[in-house]
Amino acid sequence: MPHSDELDAGDVLAVENLNIAFMQEQHKIAAVRNLSFSLQRGETLAIVGESGSGKSVTALALMRLLEQAGGLVQCDKMLLQRRSREVIELSEQSAAQMRHVRGADMAMIFQEPMTSLNPVFTVGEQIAESIRLHQNASREEAMVEAKRMLDQVRIPEAQTILSRYPHQLSGGMRQRVMIAMALSCRPAVLIADEPTTALDVTIQAQILQLIKVLQKEMSMGVIFITHDMGVVAEIADRVLVMYQGEAVETGSVEQIFHAPQHPYTRALLAAVPQLGAMKGLDYPRRFPLISLEHPAKQEPPIEQKTVVDGEPVLRVRNLVSRFPLRSGLLNRVTREVHAVEKVSFDLWPGETLSLVGESGSGKSTTGWALLRLVESQGGEIIFNGQRIDTLSPGKLQALRRDIQFIFQDPYASLDPRQTIGDSILEPLRVHGLLPGKEAAARVAWLLERVGLLPEHAWRYPHEFSGGQRQRICIARALALNPKVIIADEAVSALDVSIRGQIINLLLDLQRDFGIAYLFISHDMAVVERISHRVAAMYLGQIVEIGPRRAVFENPQHPYTRKLLAAVPVAEPSRQRPQRVLLSDDLPSNIHLRGEEVAAVSLQCVGPGHYVAQPQSEYAFMRR
C-alpha cells in the first residue's frame, strides 16, 4: 500500500517506534525499544553501540528477516521509498513481496562474508542469481552484469574471479564480492553490518572509500553499523548511538564527536584507542574501561614489565610454509603459494610479540605453522628447548596444552551442537586435568573473566552475538593455563569496551602467569597498546621487527609506514588522502614449483630494531 505523503522530503527510509523482542523460556526479552530514525537519499547514517545494543537486530528487522528466527517486531511506521519512487510500508509486505524488495530496493552486507556466501556455488553464480531474480535477465546477461559489478568494486581479473569459489578468495576479496552482490540491483538503501571489522587496515580503508564512491554514483542511502568510532568519523554524515536497545543520542558526526551530550556517547569516544597514545612509553598499558558514571575511567598507569630474561620460550628459525596449486589435464602441482618464507623470531616468557600486515602477508599461516595446523616445508620451531616441528602426533597433542590458539572466526571455532560450557570444558576433559565439579567451577570463573555470566554455559553458540562468541573462544583458550597463546585477530570483532576488557584480561594473565602472546592483528591502535615488540610481515617475510616504541615512533620500512598511515582516526574533520582502489596492494606470492625467493636481509638500525631494505620502492608505496 503506497504511503507517498508520509515521508519527509529527501527521506528514503523512516522508522517510528520500532520495538523488537524475543521469547526465551516463555518470557519476552526486549531487544529494541521505541527506536525512531530516518535516512535521506545519498546520506550515511552510522548506528553505533556495543555488542548487544540492538544494532544488528534493527537491521534484520528492516530486512524482515527476524520473523523466521522467532523475533517479535512491532512498529508504528517503517516506510521505504523504492527505486521506482513508490513508498511502501515494509511491515505490510508479504513474504513474496519482500523477496522482490530485498536486493532490488534494500540490500545488506553482513559481517562475515565467508558464512554469508554459499560455499558450493561460484562467485559468478551467486551474483548472477540476484540479477536474474530482480532484473529478469537471462543467464548470459546476468553473468555479464556480474562481471561489470566485480569491475565496479575494483576486483582485477574479474572474469577469472567469476569462476572461483568463496574459499579461494582472501577476506578482503570476499567482502568486495558481498558488496558487488548487494549493489548488483542498485538498491535505494544499503545496510552494511560491520563490513570492515575483520579486514586489515589497508583493505578496510579501500572498502570504506569504495562504499562512498558507489554511494555517490547511485545516490544511495547507507546505514552503516559499527563499533569502530574511527570508521564512523571517516564515513558517516549522521550518527545514532544505541545503548541496551534504545537510542540515547543522535546528531551530525561533528556534533557527536565534538559535543557529545549523553554520558554513554562520551564513554564510547573516550574508550577509543588512539594511535600515538603510547608515545614515549616503553611497556604495554591497560585500556580505560567504559563506565556511565565515569565516562573514561582511567586505571592507574601500571607498566607491564613482564618479560622474563633468559631463554626464549619459543624460538623460530627460517620457517617456510607453502601451499601447492594444481593445474593441467593431469592435475599436477605446477605452482606454489609462498605463504611464509624464512621467518625467524624469538618469543620470551611474559612477552607480547605482535605480527602485523595486510591480508595475504603470511601472519595467520605463521601462527598455524607453529602448532602444525599447516605443515611447514623448512625451518625449526623450538619450544622450551625442544624441537616441535618433528614431533609425533601423540607428543604434539600433549604439547598443545602449553600452546593454545584463538582463531579469527569464532562461529567456525565452536561446535554448534555443543553448549558453550561443554566447549570450554572439552580441553580440560581431553587432558584429564580437573574432576567434574572443579571443572564446572573453572568454566564459570572463565566466563566471568571474559565478561559473560556463569549461566551462559547452558546456551549454544547461535544464541550469542559475534563479539560474545569471540569471548567464549578466549575463555576456552585460557582453560589450560597455557605458556603461549597465539591470538589470531582475537579482538577484531569486539566493541571498544569488551575489547578493552579482554586486552586487560590478557595483560592481567600475562602479569600473573607469565604467558607469552603471539598477537596477530590488523588493529594498529590495539597493537600499540598491548605489544612489547612488533614485526611487520610482507609477502611472507618479516621486513621490520623491533621494540614497539621504536617501530611505531620511528618506522623505517615503507611498508610499515603505509600500515600506520591507513589507520582510521576518530576525527571527522581530518582530511584523508584519496587511495587507489586496488583489490590487493600486494604483488603475487605464487611462484613456479621449485622457484626460490630471495630472503630479505635484515639490518640493525637500533637496539633490537631490524629492518629490510626494499628491493623495489614503488611496490611498497602504492596507494
Swiss-Prot record:
Protein name from the UniProt record: Glutathione import ATP-binding protein GsiA
Keyword NAD: no
Gene3D superfamilies in UniProt: P-loop containing nucleotide triphosphate hydrolases (3.40.50.300)
Catalyzed reactions per annotation: glutathione(out) + ATP + H2O = glutathione(in) + ADP + phosphate + H(+)
Organism of derivation: Escherichia coli O1:K1 / APEC
Residues the entry annotates as binding ATP: 49-56, 357-364
Name of encoding gene: gsiA
InterPro entries membership: AAA+_ATPase (IPR003593), ABC_transp_ATP-bind (IPR050319), ABC_transporter-like_ATP-bd (IPR003439), ABC_transporter-like_CS (IPR017871), Oligopep_ABC_C (IPR013563), P-loop_NTPase (IPR027417)
Keyword tags: ATP-binding, Cell inner membrane, Cell membrane, Hydrolase, Membrane, Nucleotide-binding, Repeat, Translocase, Transport
